[in-house]
Curated annotation (Swiss-Prot):
It comes from the Eukaryota. This is Photosystem II reaction center protein K. InterPro entries: PSII_PsbK (IPR003687), PSII_PsbK_sf (IPR037270). It comes from Euglena viridis. Belongs to the PsbK family. Its main location: plastid.
Amino acid sequence: MFSINFLGLLPEAYAPFDPIVDVLPIIPLLFLLLAFVWQSSVRFR
């Protein structure tokens, strides 16, 4: 019972972090782009 009530409160508790959660899926793509930039810089050096 406690876990169900606790999960019910989570969305309200984490409401200020909604913009951060919206950005989180983009972070792996940034690392992928960083890998390409790093490889190109190493290749041309």
